[in-house]
Amino acid sequence: STLGTTILLSKIAKLFPPGVINVINGDEKIGMALNSASLVRSISFTGGGNVAKLIMKDAAKNLKRVQFELGGNDPAIILEDLDFDKYMNRIIDGTFTRAGQVCKATKRIYVPEHRADEFFEILYKRLNEFKIGYQLNPESNMGPINNKNQYNFIKSLGAGLIANNKNAYEVGQSIDDYWQ
């Protein structure tokens, strides 16, 4: 699901002689075939830890070089004296850049309890001003979700909060249900 990145990488690979760098997108079947092929000497994988363990185990049989970019779980820690108006855009960018689908995206925000209402009031206001659209359009704040699985995962996070009697706020506007 990192198709955009690999397309860009394939364009960069054209700067090298043919066969030096090969970029192939595919599902598990293609990935495992490449992983077990003796001609493949190096594997770069972006994804989750469970799949990375399988790749590493299989790659070890032929002592292949491996490089992983695994999903992060990064917090934003808000200090007592933070000027919310001044820094809220940085917090939002850290959370929603590429629709939040980057490994270093902020997954949770810790706010001093006595400032939580103030923080979330400003955050809620700014997020309601978001415009979802084509990511290269300067008027858009955020592009679309990368794939249906990610979309469903995000929806399940909100449902889980509600099921556990936590506060969940829906902000922004809905776009057509692309995945139906």
What would you call each of these model-derived segments?
Residues 14, 36, 57-61:
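Solvent-exposed polar/charged
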Residues 14-25, 165:
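N-terminal Rossmann NAD(P)-binding subdomain characteristic of aldehyde/semialdehyde dehydrogenases
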Residues 6, 23-41:
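A structured beta-alpha segment of the ubiquitous adenosine-cofactor-binding alpha/beta core
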Residues 1, 25, 46, 79-80:
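Short beta->alpha connector loops at strand-helix junctions that form conserved
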Residues 1-17, 63, 85:
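Conserved small-residue-rich beta-alpha loop and adjacent elements
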Residues 3-4, 11, 28-30, 49-51, ...:
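Short alpha-helical
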Residues 19, 42, 48-180:
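ALDH superfamily catalytic-core signature
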